[in-house]
Amino acid sequence: MRLIDLGVTPLIIEREPFPRYHIGESMTGECGGLLRDLGLGDRMLEVGHPIKHGVNVYGTRGNKDWWVPVMQRLPDGSMKEQFTWQVRRSDFDAMMLDEATSRGAEKLDARATAPLVGDDGEIRGVTATTHDERTIEIEAPLTLDCTGQASFLANKKATGPKYLGAYDKQIAVFSQISNFRRDNGEDRADQPDNTHIFYTKKYHWAWAIPIDDQVTSVGIVIPAEYFREKGEQKTDFLRRELHDLNPGLSGRIDGEPVFVEGAHVIPNYSFQVRKFAGPGYMCVGDSHRFIDPIFSFGLYVAMKEAGLAANAAVKYLAGEGRGTDDPFHDYMVGVEMAIDRIEDLVDAFWENPLAFAVMTHRKFRNGTIDNLAGRFFDDHGCPMEERDAATAAFRKLLGRDRSYDESGLYSMPIGSRFHPERAPLWNSNLDSIATTEAWMRDLD
């Protein structure tokens, strides 16, 4: 939609029909702002997506240890109460695709199989297989990879190498239930459709996200080894964890959880792609970097980067940077520095949740609200001193100094997340998997 607004007609290649299943999503405050900027705020209200006023985080005793409200940062630096939405992704994604095509985007039902690479090494489009098994070549001056964790271009080795991150041995087990008891108070923290996060120990937590007026998405994120040790079927595992993980969670489910679908399992590993934009291509969102889903940044990052990529793409198509090895330098640097802020916040939470809670409640409340809202990119047009102070505090807590390589293109991930001697992760078996969703689906 951003490209269309800027006078460019994109061709969207979709391998699977819509609507299609996707895990439910909690939007950040800035994600809601992007939808309003696209003129879709009224549409979101008309459709009836649950309204999110913020996030309640529960400590090990089951108490609401801290509350993060959705707040809008105004140009003068002040904050204003705002709201965003929870969405059932199958419905939301279908709405966004319909909106894009109604505004002028073209859509092709096909499966991209390989990038087209010119003699000079520049990507010039993709080879695709249509639903009637015809192989076609689609040439384009610019290819945008928006395939999410399937990482089409990285897995085809068209980018720099793809490295595993810190959260490379976790999985999420999730489903939907109809008997999660919601709040119904007057305060914003007690509104019925807020997000709830339940913590029990490092890398072991649960979510509850209302996705309509009856159904709540619930899920457990745990180390994969813990899941294997239990030796339980997915649904049995999830049922027990909903009862055992945190008293704040079990206290909101009357009796046994009433599942409205079966349980699902997906890998939850983090990764980082080097050189994720170059001559003829750009990677957007999870297709080049993924950290941890605990604070629901994924959808916002995808939409935010899409806007930044659209601006850079228009300049490139007009000739700016064409013929150079590094036409998207500013895009990559801006994105890397923003995602670094996410990584530092998430790592601080996991490494020292008590100190994190104290910092967010007392010294750096507004700065943490900025980060959790999604204001970690540097183009908000309002003061970000409080955000930067919070980020500096998280890095100090971690004993971390952020450094960048000599070209200024990439952050250098810290500690165990990056070893020069470690071979890059190439998920080169992607061709043998029927669909993106199948790749993300059940492990057993």
Task: List PLM regions with ranges.
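C-terminal helical "tail/cap" subdomain of flavin- and related membrane-associated enzymes
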Residues: 314-444
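Mobile, glycine/GP-rich and aromatic-enriched active-site lid/loop segments adjacent to catalytic centers
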Residues: 67, 199-203, 209-273, 278-279, ...
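N-terminal FAD cofactor-binding segment of flavoenzymes
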Residues: 20-64
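Glycine-rich FAD pyrophosphate-binding loop
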Residues: 4-23
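Predominantly flavin-linked oxidoreductase catalytic cores and closely associated redox partners
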Residues: 99-249
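FAD/FMN-dependent oxidoreductases across multiple families
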Residues: 226-312, 316-338
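Helix-loop-beta segment of a Rossmann-like dinucleotide-binding subdomain
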Residues: 65-87, 125, 221-225
